[in-house]
Amino acid sequence: MRFLSLVGNSFGCSASGERLVSAARDGDLQEAKALLDYNPRLARYSTFGVRNSPLHYSAAQGHHEIVSLLVESGVDINLRNYRGQTALMQACQHGHWEVVLILILFGANIHRSDYLNGGTALHLAALNGHPRCIRILLSEYIPSVPNCWSLLKNKKTSVAGFDSSVLHEVINRAADGGITPLHVAALNGHIETVQLLLDLGASVTQVTVEDGTTIDLIGAGSTALHYASCGGNTQCCQLLISKGACLAAVNSNGWTPMMVARSWHRNWLEEILNPTTEQPQLHLPNVPSPFLCLPLMSIVNIAQECGWRENDCLTPCRDPCAVCLERKCTVAADGCAHEFCTNCALYLSTTSITSSKTSNVTPGSVPCPLCRNGIVSFTKLPHTTATTRTSTSSRTSISLSFCTCSSDVLDTALLTNPHYSCKPVVSRTGSRTPQSARSSAFRSLSCRRFPPSLCLGGSDVDEPRSRLIGGSYSRSGVGFRRSTSQVEGKRSWFSALNHCVTTGGSAC
């Protein structure tokens, strides 16, 4: 009876949370604002069972304004659902680059992996063919320097503050079974994604492994060319071959890429995958991906330091941004020195196709909307100052309780500890109620055995974190262990997430 009373109480407190979930899913910004003004703690609500928060729903649907509202209301930006996915992962899965950009600006962790396949946000973006999301995810690793394209091509280890080994480790991080972002992009035939990954240092020689947790229908020891051969995209195969992919590579099944193509009835690939015949000369243009976007690191750093959403009043002696005509100019483009607001510079850096065909333009630069000269980086203007953000805890309403175990006020100290247990009941006047005066009904609602984080959207265990330490990844000792006995845990990226390949192919 004690447990049933707890469950009933938590369900009774969920009506407002479900309204916020509906508003986040449907993109109702006014409803979401009204609910959060009434109770800011609703941002930490998570649905029963799947544990999706309003942040997950708004990110999956691409409602970037609601995402900003929820993050500013104090929700954990790296909150996971039952599959271990964060809001950043779901935004990358559906290709909502605006949401990805906002989450990156607020400091979302790009290295977290899910519980089923060990894939990161980078894997999901590559799987579904979203190169713009990939470029935003890697904005902290690609410098805004004129010679960046040559550094990436020559694969120099450390030049001008750029450490290619760190970028190489991030972009070639493997999920369960050794699956890299290049594997899943090549499998699904996303040529633009494959080109961007190769330009940023993705390895064509990295192979999958047999780790006992995945079922690989192609075979362990497969390269990205094996996966491209299974997918059947001619351009992907040609691009991988031009970057040095080996036609004679053999996986654990003894299959070459040509044999994989035959087993999946991709007969049109045999001519270019046959290692014994003379390969035709491939005349692929030696130009960077149109999504390279060199200015991205510089403007993201400025936005994180000085803000990007402030609509400051313009002084009479200062001209507005020439693009939006609403905000004051805060940054200037290196070279042409044209001034923009931070918001417009962010939009320009993420949506413009980079220049690559003009000989006098730096590869990877974006064209200036005023003079069409290439922009490699942005610098903040002298009057642009760092912003001081208001602490989200100070905005939390203490007068409105949410998902508490009694009808009284939740102690503010409990909000900072996800493993708290209920303290003695606090009266509405703020004084503690004597033990003798407490009713048995309130005593029966003690939640020491019922984690309040299930209502508040927090985690009741320490979640695994992948951190970049000294150029390598280390996982905390309290990491999540995937059970090899679970059916879902054994589904590989190939069998669980591939949308273009059926499982009815015959073996060689």
Curated annotation (Swiss-Prot):
Disruption phenotype: Delay in development and flowering. Deficiency in lateral root formation. ANK repeats lie at residues 50-79, 83-112, 117-147, 177-206, 220-249. Pathway: Protein modification; protein ubiquitination. Pfam families: Ank (PF00023), Ank_2 (PF12796), RING_XB3-XBAT31 (PF24921). It catalyses: S-ubiquitinyl-[E2 ubiquitin-conjugating enzyme]-L-cysteine + [acceptor protein]-L-lysine = [E2 ubiquitin-conjugating enzyme]-L-cysteine + N(6)-ubiquitinyl-[acceptor protein]-L-lysine. Keywords: ANK repeat, Developmental protein, Metal-binding, Repeat, Transferase, Ubl conjugation pathway, Zinc, Zinc-finger. A zinc finger (RING-type) spans 321-372. It is an enzyme of class 2 (transferase). Its EC number is 2.3.2.27. It comes from the Eukaryota. Induction: By auxin. Gene3D superfamilies: Ankyrin repeat-containing domain, Zinc/RING finger domain, C3HC4 (zinc finger). GO terms for biological process: lateral root formation; negative regulation of ethylene biosynthetic process; protein autoubiquitination; protein ubiquitination; response to auxin; ubiquitin-dependent protein catabolic process. InterPro entries: Ankyrin_rpt, Ankyrin_rpt-contain_sf, RING_XB3-like, Znf_RING, Znf_RING/FYVE/PHD, Znf_RING_CS. GO terms for molecular function: ubiquitin-protein transferase activity; zinc ion binding. Interacts with ACS4 and ACS7. E3 ubiquitin-protein ligase that mediates ubiquitination of ACC synthases (ACS). Negatively regulates ethylene biosynthesis probably via ubiquitin-dependent degradation of ACS4 and ACS7 enzymes. Regulates lateral root formation and development by controlling ethylene production which inhibits lateral root formation at high concentration. This is E3 ubiquitin-protein ligase XBAT32. It comes from Arabidopsis thaliana. The lineage of its organism: Eukaryota, Viridiplantae, Streptophyta, Embryophyta, Tracheophyta.
